[in-house]
Amino acid sequence: MASTADFKNGLVLNIDGQLWQITEFQHVKPGKGPAFVRTKLKNVLSGKVVDKTFNAGVKVETATVDRRDTTYLYRDGDSFVFMDSQDYEQHHLSPELVGDAHRFLLEGMTVQVAFNEGAALYIELPVSVELEVTHTEPGLQGDRSSAGTKPATVETGAEIQVPLFINTGDRLKVDTRDASYLGRVNG
């Protein structure tokens, strides 16, 4: 059990038998009336996001989530295979569980997999990854009034928007949360 004072981003709550992860929270102390906590909760299994308000001091049941470092090995038909870095056990995860993260998965990449009672819940990619551009059209200078972008396909097959000076073969740093270009990687 956790009090609303213990709320933090990433905490997983068990509400009515379903697991919800706190993505945002705010303690509110109005001029009149009791304090409360406004939260945004994401359903761990379905990905659905809801707003929920808790009275300050209320106790809420938490779920035990074990985050383990794993290495992405390969895709096997309809599943993604990850190996636990501690006990070398292999876990076959469904495309639904992996979600949009598959757009940035490279073989040998270390990712965190969250488990609850032995069952995988979701994966957490690093905030940024380095990927090579496999295809992009050449950017033309001077054909616009402001700085422009163009689509580029990276080695995982994902398409991201990049500045016009990026060429095929360049290595980029990409934000995995929103698929945005962060910069070029030298070397």
Curated annotation (Swiss-Prot):
SUPFAM superfamilies: Nucleic acid-binding proteins, Translation proteins SH3-like domain. SMART domains: EFP, Elong-fact-P_C. Signal peptide: none annotated. One of its GO terms (cellular component) is cytoplasm. Coiled coil: none annotated. Its main location: cytoplasm. GO terms for biological process: peptide biosynthetic process. It is found in: Cytoplasm. Keywords: Cytoplasm, Elongation factor, Protein biosynthesis. It comes from the Bacteria. Pfam families: EFP (PF01132), EFP_N (PF08207), Elong-fact-P_C (PF09285). Disulfide bonds: none annotated. Pathway: Protein biosynthesis; polypeptide chain elongation. Transmembrane segments: none annotated. One of its GO terms (molecular function) is translation elongation factor activity. Involved in peptide bond synthesis. Stimulates efficient translation and peptide-bond synthesis on native or reconstituted 70S ribosomes in vitro. Probably functions indirectly by altering the affinity of the ribosome for aminoacyl-tRNA, thus increasing their reactivity as acceptors for peptidyl transferase. Belongs to the elongation factor P family. NCBIfam families: efp, PRK00529.1. This is Elongation factor P. The lineage of its organism: Bacteria, Bacillati, Actinomycetota, Actinomycetes, Mycobacteriales.
